[in-house]
Regions:
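N-terminal non-catalytic cap/leader segment that marks the start of a structured domain
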Residues: 1-91, 95, 188, 198, ...
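Buried hydrophobic positions in well-ordered alpha/beta secondary-structure cores of metabolic enzymes
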Residues: 3, 15, 98, 129, ...
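Catalytic-pocket segment enriched in acidic/His residues
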Residues: 47-50, 56-60, 76, 159-271
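A generic local secondary-structure boundary/capping motif
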Residues: 56-58, 85-88, 112-121, 135-142, ...
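RNA pseudouridine synthases
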Residues: 72, 128-153
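A short secondary-structure junction signal
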Residues: 79-80, 108-111, 116-117, 138-143, ...
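A gly/proline- and charged-residue-enriched helix-loop-helix capping module
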Residues: 91-109
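A structural-propensity feature for long, helix-poor, extended segments
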Residues: 103-128
Length: 271
């Protein structure tokens, strides 16, 4: 099931994304409530074609908090060391986290604004987990019961600021640094979700990977975070970028693809 957040004439709404069996097009079936409240939601009877010019897809959630897993793939840890961005090619033994503010979130087709004070802005394609229930001190065995679904995320990073920003607050938390979307997919094999990235329409093979290669699994990440912080419905965990990242310049088109979810596309503009 795909759950989307969208707007018509500026009013945010939620919908199921469903394919019409007759014309093969995707439609937004509007819902009466907010799926993350735990209350039952019902179709309102309104539906809109996904390609309707009046429809604007929004980020599927505005989280109260966003966690990111640092160097959670061996290939990415080695890549960062090779580029001089990390002192060691070995990933950390324990899960290392950083955070992004909710103000960094943008949706599909929203512009990524490259700050004027940075000369090296990078993409990082990832799978994001969306929490569906309040989670506090949950075990790995029960962690997946607290997941609503998954979406694409681009963990946009100002690489030239990262070395001088040990907490990564500015280099990863600036406005527009967290594109999310296009929707939440509730049915995804999180153990082997394939990630790829296209820059200006061309696939970047060295940026691709699969969650099968995660060092710290999704259940492990949820259990660890919930051991010290309460996760709320709509909170997001960025699970890690699989391999290489690369530079983004003004007018570049950045597309994160996760098999089973779809495409998250954004264009870069200079501040």
């Amino acid at each position: 099931m795909r759950i989307a957040r969208f707007s018509i004439n500026g009013t945010p709404r939620y919908a199921f994304v469903q394919e019409d069996e007759q014309d093969g097009k995707d439609y937004l079936v509007e819902l009466s409530g907010y799926p993350l409240t735990g209350q039952q939601v019902e179709p309102t009877g309104q539906r809109y074609a996904l390609d309707d010019e009046k429809v604007r897809l929004l980020a599927p959630v505005i989280p109260s908090k966003i966690y990111g897993a640092a160097k959670n793939y061996r290939a990415h840890a080695a890549y960062m060391a090779e580029k001089g961005q990390s002192p060691s090619p070995e990933p950390p033994e324990r899960l290392v986290l950083f955070m992004k503010p909710s103000t960094s979130v943008i949706g599909p087709d929203d512009p990524i604004v490259k700050p004027s004070y940075s000369k090296d802005m990078n993409y990082e394609p990832e799978v994001a987990v969306v929490i569906g229930r309040i989670a506090r001190k949950v075990s790995q065995a029960e962690a997946m019961d607290y997941v609503l679904g998954y979406t694409c995320v681009n963990d946009v990073t100002l690489r030239d600021l990262q070395q001088d920003d040990p907490m990564w607050t500015r280099c990863k938390g600036f406005d527009t640094a967290c594109p999310l979307g296009p929707w939440i997919e509730t049915d995804l094999d999180y153990r082997d979700a394939k990630i790829s990235f296209r820059l200006n329409g061309e696939e970047v093979p060295e940026a691709s990977g699969t969650t099968a290669d995660l060092i710290h699994s999704i259940p492990e990440q949820i259990a660890f975070i919930s051991s010290f912080a309460t996760l709320l419905p709509g909170d997001v965990i960025m699970t890690g970028t699989p391999h290489a990242s690369g530079s983004l310049q003004g007018r570049d088109e950045a597309t994160v693809h996760v098999e089973g979810i779809g495409d998250l596309r954004n264009v870069v503009i200079d501040e």
